Structure formats: C-alpha cells, structure tokens
Amino acid sequence: MALRVTADVWLARPWQCLHRTRALGTTAKVAPKTLKPFEAIPQYSRNKWLKMIQILREQGQENLHLEMHQAFQELGPIFRHSAGGAQIVSVMLPEDAEKLHQVESILPHRMPLEPWVAHRELRGLRRGVFLLNGADWRFNRLQLNPNMLSPKAIQSFVPFVDVVARDFVENLKKRMLENVHGSMSINIQSNMFNYTMEASHFVISGERLGLTGHDLKPESVTFTHALHSMFKSTTQLMFLPKSLTRWTSTRVWKEHFDSWDIISEYVTKCIKNVYRELAEGRQQSWSVISEMVAQSTLSMDAIHANSMELIAGSVDTTAISLVMTLFELARNPDVQQALRQESLAAEASIVANPQKAMSDLPLLRAALKETLRLYPVGSFVERIVHSDLVLQNYHVPAGTFVIIYLYSMGRNPAVFPRPERYMPQRWLERKRSFQHLAFGFGVRQCLGRRLAEVEMLLLLHHMLKTFQVETLRQEDMQMVFRFLLMPSSSPFLTFRPVS
C-alpha cells in the first residue's frame, strides 16, 4: 500500500503572481454549437524583429515558458501566432492533448531541430529517430523499440543501472563520512549529470566511463565536455534562422559542429568495440548497441546515428529531473520521510530483484510525476497534424503545427487543484488521463522513457535509504529555458546519514 503524505508542504511557485493565475477550465462550459473558423483563434502578436534582437542579445529565450504562460492567462487556453511563414497553434489542456493523440497517424510528424540537422547534413551523416520523420522514422523506431521499451529490455538494463546507482551512493557516502562534520553540502547538479551519463552510457554501449568516482578516463572528460557544449550551443542557435546566424554566430556554429564531431567519433569507437568483440568470438555483454548490431536490421550508419541521439537525449533530461526532485524533498521533509519509509519497506524485494523498483515504489513514482508537473524538462510536446481536428471549438486544418505547453498545464488550477503545492499523493488518488505528458504520447513518445524512469527510481531509492537531504533554501528555484527547462543555478543540498 502506498504511504500517504498529510503534512504541510512548501509552496512551489516557479512563476510570477501565482495567486492571480486564472483557472482555464477544461470542460466546464458547454461548447457553442457553431464551429469557429481557424482565423477566429485568439492571436498572439509580437514584433518579430524586436524578438530576434532580444534572442541575439540574450543568446536564447530563457523566459519562453513564462512568456507562453502569460499568453495563456491573457488569451485563454488556445492561441495562435505565425513564425517563419507557418501558423502555430498553442494549447495547454489535457483534453486537447487527447484530441491530438486521437487523430495521430502512424507517422507522427514533428519539426526537426535545425542545428542538429545542419551538422548531419554538413558531415554527410544519417539522422536518427529524434530527427527523422515519415517512413524512415517508423522503420528505425520499430527496430529500436524492443531494445529500449520492451519488458525484456527493461529486465536487461535494470542490473546495469542498479550497479551504477549503488556505486554513486557508496562514493557519496564515503565522501560524506570523510568530512569531519559527518555531513556534506554540495552543488548537486554536476553529480547528477555524472550519474545519468554513467548509467546511460553503460546501458547503451556496455562500457563504463568512470564518472561515479573511480577509473575516470581522459576521453570520458572530453566526451562529457562535448555534450555540455553541444547543448549550450543548441540553445543559442535554435530560435533564429540559419540564414541569419551563419553571419551573426559563426563562433557558436563552430563550437556546435566541433562538439558533435567529438560525440560522433566517440560513438564510432564504441560501435567498433562491439564489432571487434563479435569478430574475436568473445563473450558479448548486453548493451543497446550490441543488440542493434546482432539484429542486423539497421546499417552501420543508422546504428551510429541512433546511438548518438540516444546518448545525447538521455543525460541532461534525467539529471535535471533528479536535481529538482531532491530539492523538493529537501524542503518537504515529511514527503521525504514518507518516501524513505516506502523504500525501506520495499528494500528486501528490490535487493532480490532490482526490477521490483518499478512496481513496489508507487509513492516515489508519484513524486517523479509531481516533479515533472512543476518542472517539465521538455516543456512542450509538438506535432504537425495530419488531418483536420477541432480544438476548443476552433477548426484546425491539417498541416498546422500544434504545441502543447506542459509548463502551463501543470500550473492550471482547473487541472491540478492547488498547483503551487508539491503533493505526490495527488497522482495516487485518481487516474489523470493525458496530464502526465513529460515523455510525450503515442507511438512517438520518448524512446528513453523506461531507461530514465529506472535511473531515477533506483538512484532515489538508494539515496533515500542512506541520506537525509536538507536545504536552507525555501524559496523557489528560478527556472530558465535553455533547450531544456532547468534551474538557473544548482541548488545547494546537504546530505546527512539516516539516523
């Protein structure tokens, strides 16, 4: 039985003027009988030239989530605007996400990430499932699903993640006990990045990087620096047309391409290691790459492309979610204690079978959903619709680009009563259809979803048994949009042994 939390929790107010946030109802009003035309959708207007200047000056759009949240407050649960000659419709209610899912084809289409595509085209490399659309996307995705999402795959990679999670906690415990105070205060974000990088890389390539405290390889440092640089430069380039940034941001483009080149070279080496083991007849350890090679359904180029994207997409997203969960647990000690009791009660079954963490920690799973409600790392889900549909009684024609803003959905009092409160138990009280979309939906949902869930559940389970997590900071973290939604600075957390 899930442990329930009844104590007061700290208010999470990661946006301005929460007490004036308007509840944008879902189905309270009877829709008018006459269908409204697309042109009647409220329009969000902004001066595109001033916006470009702002993006150039700020090297990104750090307040995008706040700007869109304010637009919903002013215009209602649906609005439209134009960008690059295309019409974009923005929504934020679960019912509209469900309607998008209902009309989704077997080939869901989304906009490619231009800086990543530019690198692939310049270097003559193939795209992976993150960047592909159409039949090529479907073929690649069907080959990868069994290695990432199936029960058999989860059973295969859980032991890999559990080893890394235990190593990480043991190393942190050792550092804590070496401190004369018997506790340790650290900037947790870099530590979470190292953990998720180590775990994801181990699952995908079958090799350890040494980021959790031992056997650190020089090439691992170069590789992780390249990942950081790639994400930073992506943010600086993604909001402006390449025709402009090729002149205004030549240094950033060079950094972006150089970073991807390092990542590409590193992944090539990992794939060659797998082929070498096969050629030498050595015992093959399980990994996502070795499974792709063994299946022989994807070309070497396709394996390389998908491996690059899997590694790039599995690190920061999970690390940020772990950081924000630990921060909320630190300032909500009663929630933390309830989770600790759940972990201790489930410890025997998880020791016998680490995969039990997926089923025996319902409150911890709910806490992760609550974190992603307040801090959706991927702050929106987007689709180019393949057929006409009706959203909020407006006609939306096929070919329209529709964006679901998760940041605003998670803060809508009509969807989540008392949205400012960190309340994991809300996810255990009733089914919430299309309200947990942090990993997307449908056949194009996040390919690394199960890996991310396992990494978060196992690490938090081992940490809660071992450490009391505290913080002196009770005010909210300022969140910024840098390709991903992340804290503007890392929270400083204190770890003490559990008494």
From Swiss-Prot:
Subcellular localization(s) per the UniProt record: Mitochondrion inner membrane
Gene field: Cyp11b1
GO cellular component: mitochondrial inner membrane
Documented EC number(s): 1.14.15.4
Top class in the EC scheme: oxidoreductase
Name by which UniProt lists this protein: Cytochrome P450 11B1, mitochondrial
Protein family per UniProt: Belongs to the cytochrome P450 family.
GO MF, any single term: heme binding
Record's function text: A cytochrome P450 monooxygenase involved in the biosynthesis of adrenal corticoids. Catalyzes a variety of reactions that are essential for many species, including detoxification, defense, and the formation of endogenous chemicals like steroid hormones. Steroid 11beta, 18- and 19-hydroxylase with preferred regioselectivity at 11beta, then 18, and lastly 19. Catalyzes the hydroxylation of 11-deoxycortisol and 11-deoxycorticosterone (21-hydroxyprogesterone) at 11beta position, yielding cortisol or corticosterone, respectively, but cannot produce aldosterone.
Annotated residues for binding of heme: C446
Tissue-level expression: Adrenal zona fasciculata/reticularis.
Gene3D superfamilies the record matches: Cytochrome P450 (1.10.630.10)
Pathway this chain belongs to: Steroid biosynthesis; glucocorticoid biosynthesis; Steroid hormone biosynthesis
Keywords: Heme, Iron, Membrane, Metal-binding, Mitochondrion, Mitochondrion inner membrane, Monooxygenase, Oxidoreductase, Steroidogenesis, Transit peptide
Annotated phenotype, changing V381L: In strain: Dahl salt-resistant
Membrane topology listed for this record: Peripheral membrane protein
Cofactor(s) needed: heme
Reactions it catalyzes: a steroid + 2 reduced [adrenodoxin] + O2 + 2 H(+) = an 11beta-hydroxysteroid + 2 oxidized [adrenodoxin] + H2O; 21-hydroxyprogesterone + 2 reduced [adrenodoxin] + O2 + 2 H(+) = corticosterone + 2 oxidized [adrenodoxin] + H2O; 21-hydroxyprogesterone + 2 reduced [adrenodoxin] + O2 + 2 H(+) = 18-hydroxy-11-deoxycorticosterone + 2 oxidized [adrenodoxin] + H2O; 21-hydroxyprogesterone + 2 reduced [adrenodoxin] + O2 + 2 H(+) = 19-hydroxy-11-deoxycorticosterone + 2 oxidized [adrenodoxin] + H2O
Outcome, altering V443M: In strain: Dahl salt-resistant
A Pfam family annotated for this UniProt entry: p450
